[in-house]
Structure formats: structure tokens, C-alpha cells
Amino acid sequence: MSVIKSKRDESEMEFIYTARQLHIHTIQKCANFPKRYTFYVSQPMAACATRIHEYVKCANSIYPLNQHEVQIRRDYLLRANAELYNLVSQIEVANELFGIDGDSVKFWMDIVEREIRLVKGTMKKDRERYKNLP
């Protein structure tokens, strides 16, 4: 059964899809950078996007049964959040170096900002969801 677009909510798993979308978009953008900057700009950016995707997948793979497992899940989400802010800095540097099209940078940063919001929201929901575990 279809849901009217205006009535749809975000899925609880949206942060994984957005991380994947960010990973793919970052690699596509890095492939267009000049080859002489591969080791200085492209590889670190692609690696950062890869780590973000890996960390959210790792966090999602943990089904907490106690507070220790909740903390492990939270640690992965915190790492993903830190990498997202790292990626913001790298996008800014790449924009200064290569003069990336404004619309392209805006689209890229919108994905990053959305992922930051989703990861923080997931951490907040987890805090409420798992507060009564032993």
C-alpha cells in the first residue's frame, strides 16, 4: 500500500542509506579530481567516506542486550559523526583547490548535513530506547 509523499516519515534505517549515498557520491567526485592530487586529496576523502559507511553499518549490526553493547554501538556512531565533520573540512579544501561547481558542492554538503542529522538522531533515539538495559 502506498503512502502519500507528504505523509511519509524518515525510516529508522535512513542513516545507512544516506551513508551509502554519500560514499558513492564522494568516490564519483574524487574520480574527477586531477590525478596529481590523488594521494593528497582524493584518497583521503574517499577513505573518509568509506569509514563513515563502515561505521554506521557496524553500529547497525549491534543489537544491544546490555549497557556495554549500547556503548559499543554509540562509539561507532560517534566515530561516524567525527568522520562526517572531517569530510566537511576536506570538501572545503577540495572546493578551494579545484573550484568545484557551486550546485555540486551544495548537493554534496546537503548529503553530509543530512547524515550528521540522522546519526545524531539515531544516537538520541538509542539513548531513549536502551536506557533500561542492565
Across the structure, where does each feature detected by a protein language model lie?
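Amphipathic alpha-helical assembly/interaction segments
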Residues: 1-134
